[in-house]
Amino acid sequence: WSPVMMRYLERVAEVTPPFRVAVEVRNRSWMEGEARDSFLSLLRSANMAYVAVDEPELAWTVGRDFPVTASWGAVARFHGRNREAWSKKGVTVAEKFRYNYSDDELGSWEAPARAAAGEAERVFLMFNNCFRDYAVKNALRMKCLLGIACSPGEGVQGEIPFDE
């Protein structure tokens, strides 16, 4: 967080209508104390969505708070919780996002997603744990956990063979 970045977001809010904008931050400083209040207030006043992030809990990461700031939608992105890879420098994208969520981890988002659905027109849960087929399988599993058109066998935790 910085005053310069807040001014930048204010400018984004001025020039982007009628487009819908979602803002994802990657440093805890945005969601602490007065910075959090002013940041979320700006998003609400501009009808821009805060992007909640599921990522490893590290000293600098944002945390799993899911405030709804836009009437048109609530957004969460799932990057995986590969703490070891996120803590290292120079890791590949594949290493960083090599994370397959458990049902318990996905289930921890059920109540926040349902609460967001009561405040926003739509809820977007996007999976960016893009190693092999993990994002697709986890998205299908989340769909089933939320009871959204789940077919038998959909979201089953299995391996799809890939060439290395």
Predicted regions and their residues:
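Residues lining hydrophobic/aromatic ligand-binding pockets adjacent to catalytic sites
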Residues: W1-E164
